[in-house]
Amino acid sequence: MDWSAFNLSLKLSLWTLLLLMPLGVLLGRWLAMTDFTGRSLVQALLALPLVLPPTVLGYYLLATFSQTSSTGAWYQSLTGKSLAFSFEGLLIASMIFNLPFAIQPLKRAFEQIGRDVLDAAACCGLNRWQQFFSIELPLIWPGLLGAAVLVFAHTLGEFGVVLMVGGNIPEETRTIAISIYDSVPVSYTHLTLPTIYSV
């Protein structure tokens, strides 16, 4: 087993989880509790990673992160590193790819909170932050846990986006999914050659 690839996948999953969950909570709450013009359009845009094939999404992200793009050139001028084929680029791509898996369970969890509960809390003198931490956060806990499991598991098994954005650089962008993909032809050869020779 390629332990360096496994450790990199674990690192990517944990960082994606830590950075994406607060963003998922904010966006999920905003979509569930705010009625605004263009809400359906925003939801459709946030769901795009579910619709686009991973390799297609990865290609567009790679084009965005490349040194010839304004985003990639800005990042390189700021850090001196290329965003494409780097762990940082892989992390950003993973967050974008997993955004719907974080938002949807949390949005549904916020929608299940009764408006009367929040109105009662406001009547008791609780401000927005107090309502969020003492009432909303405990009530959305099942949705939060579900979103965390989905994001972590989905990141751990990512292949298409990882391959397009990160490539296959050992100890930098080579995840366990890429390592398994690389080992399949070798394993297949080991299995088929004895069969051919026996025939």
Kindly give the residue locations of the regions a language model identified.
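Conserved small/polar residues in nucleotide/adenosyl-binding loops
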Residues: T189-T195
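Membrane-interfacial helix termini and adjacent extracytoplasmic/periplasmic loops
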Residues: G58-M95, V165-P170
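Transmembrane alpha-helices
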Residues: L18, F101-L106, F110, G114, ...
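Glycine-rich helix-loop "coupling/hinge" segments at transmembrane-helix boundaries
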Residues: L62-A63, Q67, V161-Y188
